[in-house]
Amino acid sequence: MKTCIISFSSRGNGNCAQIGKLIRSLSEEAVLFQFSNFEIHACGKCGYECFADRSKCPYYSDMEYRLLDAVTNSDLTYFILPNYCDYPCANYFVFNERSQCYFQGHPELLEAYEKVPKRAIVVSNTNEDNFKTALAYQSYKEPDVLFLSAKKYGKVSIRGDLMTDENAVRDVTAFMRKPL
């Protein structure tokens, strides 16, 4: 099964990165993308050229389109998100906003993208509703989300050591093994 994993955290070796590595290690054909490793521009500083022709986007050559291709061509995608102020981090919103250009004038791409099963793992000690709302745009179905609270496992999220707890690893593994 082709699996695409995107970690949206800006911390290269934090909890989200560790979760992504765990998923990759337990999957047969998986690719892990660390969003913060790429220069992906937010929308703006343009004349909305993409609305007429997506290849005219001034940022067309950055990694965004390759990420969207990877998701669209996968059998399963995992989004791994940190909770910043009760919402997904800015990297996730950049990814979501920039997707408009990718799909502009190509409804078949949007349909293929939305059909890919997606699962999200959110590292959060607080709000869940905002994540469910934000993730609802990614799929036809209701978001399949695992919320991992560092507090539940006796950890402090900022330390990035959540995956050192065997119960946290067990919960992620069980989430992965759920039928689609």
Show the residue positions of the predicted features.
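A short, structured active-site edge motif that brings together acidic residues
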Residues: 35-39, 113, 149-151
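N-terminal beta1-alpha1-beta2 submodule of the flavodoxin-like/Rossmannoid cofactor-binding fold
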Residues: 1-101, 162-180
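A glycine- and small-aliphatic-rich helix-loop capping segment at beta-alpha/alpha-beta transitions
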Residues: 97-102, 135-139
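Phosphate-binding beta-alpha-beta segment of Rossmann-like dinucleotide-binding domains, i.e.
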Residues: 104-106
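Context-gated lysine
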Residues: 2, 21, 45, 56, ...
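Short, glycine-/small-residue-rich phosphate/pyrophosphate-handling segment
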Residues: 108-149
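Glycine-rich phosphate/pyrophosphate-binding loop and the adjoining helix
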Residues: 138-180
